[in-house]
């Protein structure tokens, strides 16, 4: 019936129309009386609008008549929902109350202090995160470079030393720019110290580059050739990326061992870093034992977030390994293409020298020069494939292993807490047996043990909650850094591909007139 009736013009709305609406207020008397804490409003003209907004759910004609003023009506209605001194809210506050959506009367008259108790921690967390991001911006004001690889010593006692240069404006360092000499074992020793301090409490410690016995043996005993030079450059770049990722971590940057590594001219010799040593074999045994324990521990995961993230990192690890294998194959094919292009250029040059036709001989010689330039382009692109893309994938494969490592430590922490609960239950059963057997001398001992294990259970619960909280924060930071790193590398990689193709076009366009000049 309301849809069939013609809506009157907006200018024809009279106070009588509002009086007809106000006749139905007795249906919502309790709600309106509850919301209105004072009978007199500072603005009398707003009273009809407030009544209409309160009853708009039950009368369609009102919505049709006042369609153009709907925004004003709802704005005034939202100002009335506050129970914290309504007169003061109407006079001083121009912002809408948190309760914006019209709901049931019981929800509308809920005390406002409840909404404050929910929103206050969120605001506090947000401001704390903003402060931390600002602090991280200052913390990241540090540049680290690894350069000048130098062979020290002869024979199997030789090692490579690298210059670590640091530029920073942070007050924690004594100078704004300094450099030190470090060998590869020093980097491994630094990672070992940081991992022993922070890994078991949930921090993701960037892994150091892996040792290569074959590559380093060739550098020690062999002469300088292309393979040795490539190995040294690959290790130098990996060490530089390792330090850059480490100093980006706000907690690790504060560590005294890291500052000593960057500043001290002399470091104590790092021990237990050799691959073929007793400590190295012990590490391998411990890794195998951890793998077995991981299979035997059945953790009842109650947090869906951790279960989802673990599955996500497992899938990401598999896909990264597949992509890394494909990129390595691409690098090999690109190097093979470069070698074949060089052979083609040499053959074209020899053919041009033996050709009697002058124009054809000149064109073949020019073709050989172009192919030599293209050979150089293929080599540069192969290096870009490797150092830009392949090494990034390799780094993140090892970083994901570190992420899975902190998940394993969380599982160990849960297992320790679970074992403490089981032991406490056994102690209480023992106490009950002593009381039944009426052995007062052992009852007191059992009570002391119960108090001891209750403290261990509480500590285990606190440790588990803390490591879970830390891992959540660390995974969030890791995801942001991962997206940022992949974006930067993909853009650089695409730019290198575009530049290579553009250079190829220039080479062939320059050669085209020589080919057309053959008569």
Swiss-Prot record:
UniProt-annotated stretches for the region Interaction with RhoG: 260-519
Gene Ontology, cellular component aspect: cytosol; early endosome membrane; endosome membrane; lamellipodium; lysosome; membrane; retromer, tubulation complex
Keyword Phosphoprotein included in the entry's annotation: yes
Region annotation (Membrane-binding amphipathic helix) ranges: 278-295
Membrane topology: Peripheral membrane protein
PTM sites of type Phosphoserine: 97, 117, 119, 185, 277
SMART domains in alphabetical order: PX
Annotated Low complexity bias: 30-50
Residues at which a 1,2-diacyl-sn-glycero-3-phospho-(1D-myo-inositol-3-phosphate) binds: 183, 185, 211, 235
Domain notes from UniProt: The BAR domain is able to sense membrane curvature upon dimerization. Membrane remodeling seems to implicate insertion of a N-terminal amphipathic helix (AH) in the membrane.
Subunit structure: Predominantly forms heterodimers with BAR domain-containing sorting nexins SNX5, SNX6 and SNX32; can self-associate to form homodimers. The heterodimers are proposed to self-assemble into helical arrays on the membrane to stabilize and expand local membrane curvature underlying endosomal tubule formation.
Protein name: Sorting nexin-2
Species, as recorded: Mus musculus (Mouse)
